[in-house]
Amino acid sequence: DEVFAKKGKFEADEIPAATQIFTPNWIVKYMVQNTVGRIYLDNNPYTTLAYKEKWQYLVEPAEPTPAEAILHYNELTDLKVADLACGSGHILNECFDLLYDLYITEGYTRVEAITHIFQDNLTGIDLDPRAQQLSLFALTLKACQRDHSFVDAHCLPRVLTMPKVQLLPLPADTRLAVEIDAVNTLLKDADSLGSIMKFDLTPAAREWVVSRAEENEAAALVIALTEQYDALVMNPPYMGSGNMNEVLSKYVKDNYEEVKADLFSVFMALAIERLKVHGRYGMINMQSWMFLSSFEKLRKTLLDNYHIENMLHLGPRTFDELSGEVVQNAAFVVAKHTAQQGGMYFRLLDGKSCADKEQMFLNYTGQGTKIYYPNVPQANFEKIPGCPIGYWVSKCFMNVFCNSKKLVMSHDVKKGIDTGKNEIFLRYWYEVSNCLLSLSTSTKKWFTYIKGGDFKRWYGNIELVVNWEDDGREIRKYPTSTIRNQQYMKREAITWTLLSSKCGISARYVEPNCLFDNNGSSAFPLADKYYLCAFLNSKVANVCLSILNPTLAFQVGNIASLPYKNSQYKSEIEKIAFQNIFISKYDWISHETSWDFQQNELISLIDFSEEDLATVSLTVLCNTTSHSDVATQQADENPCAAKLQDLVERYHKKWNTLFMQLHANEEELNRQFIDIYGLQDELTPDVPLNEITILQQDEVSIEGNALKWHDEVILKQLLSYAAGVWMGRYRLDKSGLHIAHPNPTTEELEPYTYNGHTIEIDDDGIFPLMAADSGFTDNACLRTAQFVSDVFGAEYQVENLNYIERTFGKTIEQYWQKDFWKDHKKMYQNRPIYWLFASKKGTFQCIAYLHRMTPYTPERIRSK
């Protein structure tokens, strides 16, 4: 934990702690039985039935291993097995058990079996000397358990670590000396490199090293790392290239260029190099090599030249000590020859724990269970762009990829900016004075910035701004920044969130004048922007993406490789998609955390009756310009009054209509794209209500198959808006922002008339959160009563205040004093625009408006 907490690159002495993890025992058995065990059975087919009962994790191939693909050995003593990243010896111990049983079956004594395993069969290597010692101890203890007399034997397991001091002496022969000197030079970095070191020795030089192996630990290591093995079984270290120290990084780039993305992929290449032809390696590692573009060359090489015989696709929760979705694994067996038959795959992703996954594997009922996928041809994977290991892909989806053009052929798909230090260059828009904020021009400092965000479809997540003053001068100077694809900046686009663990991709329409981040990568359609957005939000696209890359990240390359088809119903699809964007945009701007926010929803509904809501069109419901019209009318005409409870009911009705319309639209779009791609037998168009991405500020939850309204949230949004009115952030008689900058003018602070009442803006942007009888005439409780009277009518004031308190389950005074600040911080993502000042014991509390604060604000609070 301490090593990972420091982040950055790992030093040589930190690599063991950063890369060691205990492999579940049943997965070790699976790997050993399907490598060492399978080689033995290929050579002794008459014993298959006897061992099949003992080896419950052995996977039967669709057909026996072809004769020309069998790795033959003469005697059991010839079978060489190794773990080149053995840790404390868990895998070595399982190899020992299996080999021991084979020896006993073939008539060897216990001592003979143990001696042959230690001297002839088994090798372990680890760069951590402590792990090596544990491994030696565990194997020796196991040997003594098998035969008590072995404690007196002078035979130890062959488990090696990196030489600390002793290197190889230089031979007298000059030519050999040059080779041995190169070996010694490489061994000096052994603490960083471990088993991935490559020693290029001529036969004569290797023979010379062999002659020194018994008395020289460096020689023993070199021999072990230049040996050809029949079987390798490993849980290799996981370490991305960004965490490698300079020595390790350079060596990997120089010697393992195609697999440099991670240390586990380096070990995949190493395993092939160290295997004999027809040998097998079993490995558990991260599933990322199966899908990510950074491992595409590795996949291509593997699929073209070697055979994935079987695989347990484990996914998340493989290691019980590692929770969450990020660490996702696969265990598999690869044979060193080209594939002559299909592979056997087990899809265990749904197991909630390692034990669940084991039971899924042991108890599968055969083909068609969505767990077992037998005899899958490797050639199928190369039909899919990027050749992901998509063993579960049906023929219908395979045809979709084969018969469609890639999306990138009609749309540019681009990564965006990496600022190098988001803490310096990014802000939420409401943190910035609107004097410095540019939403459409190029003369200010802060510009709209698209950076992924929460799972939200169609529109939204437009809440950040970036320092792009003087064409991004400061970002360009920052050493780790990257400015990509600047010619696409500020163009209309379809963006998506890079990382998602919820319901797949969420694509959104982006209006012009936005810059975009690498996490907000975007596609730039020439004409069919709404069609593209509809496709990306469809089930078809989501399933295709899960084939291209079922990890948590939707990379630019994955989007570019999607199969993309036009349709004769394109115009109809675009109309529905436009409506979805329209509804989602209206939802986004109806919250005050959007810079297009106009007016609180309850106030805007005063002019809508129940009958109006039943008959009014969707366009009128979402007409954002009507807010200012309503505000102006209420400022100029006779006072109007309304019951808050009635307005909340109207709110329910209005937003239920919009929510269900969006839901129906999404299902219709799924229906259309399922037909376009001919996937009627594969997919259904239904969309769960919890995947509809409006009303995401807790206004509703889904219970059963219906919306449950949280009226207290709706009313809290009203009180938050009221606070903004008092501070001058908003005006009741005008829509949108009013004061969001320091030093407002006298004119900006002048009182105004609304609904027949004079509305005053607080003179200093400070109001107390105190009891009604505290003596402060501008405290929040008194202001709330006045606000409710001014906006909703004096005749309903008491009824409306009682309704608020009844809904909250507490008094308004208690809400302001105990809950408002917490709710405000949550709404503004811990970037509050109203700052809380409180005495040590909380006897006195007040709120100050960020944009109106001055150096004298704390003193003014004390003096008041």
Please tell me what each predicted stretch does.
Residues 621, 629-630, 637-639:
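Short, low-complexity intrinsically disordered segments enriched in A/P/G/S/L with frequent Arg
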Residues 1-70, 406-439, 447-449, 454-466, ...:
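Class I S-adenosyl-L-methionine
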Residues 6-11, 15-311, 337-338, 343-344, ...:
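SAM-dependent methyltransferase catalytic region
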Residues 54-80, 205-233, 253, 315-317, ...:
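Flexible, glycine/threonine-enriched loop-and-boundary segments that flank and lead into catalytic domains
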Residues 43-59, 110-114, 148-156, 586-599, ...:
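Short, glycine/acidic-rich hinge or "gate" loops at secondary-structure transitions
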Residues 82-85, 125, 271-275, 520-530, ...:
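Proline-centric
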Residues 592-593, 601, 607, 612, ...:
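Terminal accessory regions of large proteins
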Residues 93, 100, 127, 132, ...:
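Signature of N6-adenine DNA methyltransferases within the class I
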